Amino acid sequence: MQVHIELKKVVDNSYDITIGTLPTLHFDTKVAVVTNSTISALHLEYLLSKISAKELYVVTLRDGEEYKNQQSIDTILEALFENRFNRKSMIIAFGGGVIGDMSGYAASIYQRGIDFIQIPTTLLSQVDASVGGKTGMNNRYGKNLVGAFHQPRAVYIDPHFLTTLPPREFGAGVAEIVKMAVTFDKDFFEFLERADLSKPEILQEAIKKALQTKAKVVTQDEKEQGIRAALNYGHTFGHVVENETAYKEFLHGEAVAIGMVMANEMAIKMNYMFEKEALRVKALLQKYNLPTTYAIKDVKAFYEAFFLDKKSSDSAITFILPLGIGDVVITDKVDTGTIMCVLNKFGKQ
């Protein structure tokens, strides 16, 4: 005996990304602004001057990837419960990628889902993390292993927030821009080689190009069942680097930069990429003072950590490897010998 449930309705998760000065936002509901202590001190007053709401609350978390955990999620949820938020209430994620991911995840599970808006304040979150609906938190097994797809209702990219960005945070954002270019757009990569991203008008053009690339990919593959997985270039290795260093040595974008160099090394071994192309990628990363070397502490443990990657299975590790600049392949056909050869090379540095 069977009872069939027909669930083929298409949910419209469309939204706009607005680039420019943040407009005044009006809400006829309760709103919780989730931020961290650093952004609160720098920009919260400016943000609050732009918000009109029925009731407005601020949830301030500690700053850092090491706080992207269940305790921080519980802090957000407690604030929502204590102030009687309902399904029509709203969360505003005001910070970098960590705040955006956790705010979105809290929104996805509170009363089985409420709306949220992204107002990213770092270059990395403006060009990548705020768009696409990936939300989540870390645990002791790895990065972003707990989470959900939950699209924001809107994203506001205000360059004003980048004026206080530390140089390392700026570089971390550039790493994600480079990732987009290597993955999908050779012309964009060549633009970045020529560009001086310290100039605001050139940076804004790079942000726009990166967002256009991300939007195109997410439109085609919202839940990462195919082409969107290509945007994890550098992340398979990078996430292990972050976890191995307890999220304290490298910013996320810095770990991704290291991961791209490692992925390129594997692509060379697989005859997917010429060494001269890998050197161009490395040079572009170094142009913005990003790390491109890493000494793996325990090669065997590093290898085993790959199996916790969301793209991998019990028996195969999925890698995103460049086919030159502007194209990549998603493959689980890399043999153990090749993987260990690459890891051993980095283990000897």
Swiss-Prot record:
Pfam families xrefs: DHQ_synthase (PF01761), DHQS_C (PF24621)
GO CC field: cytoplasm
Cofactor list: Co(2+); Zn(2+); NAD(+)
Cofactor notes: Binds 1 divalent metal cation per subunit. Can use either Co(2+) or Zn(2+).
Pathway: Metabolic intermediate biosynthesis; chorismate biosynthesis; chorismate from D-erythrose 4-phosphate and phosphoenolpyruvate: step 2/7
Protein's cellular compartments: Cytoplasm
Principal EC category: lyase
Keyword set, alphabetical order: Amino-acid biosynthesis, Aromatic amino acid biosynthesis, Cobalt, Cytoplasm, Lyase, Metal-binding, NAD, Nucleotide-binding, Zinc
Binding site for Zn(2+): E176, H235, H252
Any GO BP: aromatic amino acid family biosynthetic process
GO molecular function: 3-dehydroquinate synthase activity; metal ion binding; nucleotide binding
EC number: 4.2.3.4
Catalytic activity: 7-phospho-2-dehydro-3-deoxy-D-arabino-heptonate = 3-dehydroquinate + phosphate
NCBIfam families assigned to the protein according to its UniProt record, in alphabetical order: aroB (TIGR01357)
Function statement: Catalyzes the conversion of 3-deoxy-D-arabino-heptulosonate 7-phosphate (DAHP) to dehydroquinate (DHQ).
Cited PANTHER family: 3-DEHYDROQUINATE SYNTHASE, 3-DEHYDROQUINATE SYNTHASE, CHLOROPLASTIC
Protein name: 3-dehydroquinate synthase
Organism for this UniProt entry: Sulfurimonas denitrificans (strain ATCC 33889 / DSM 1251)
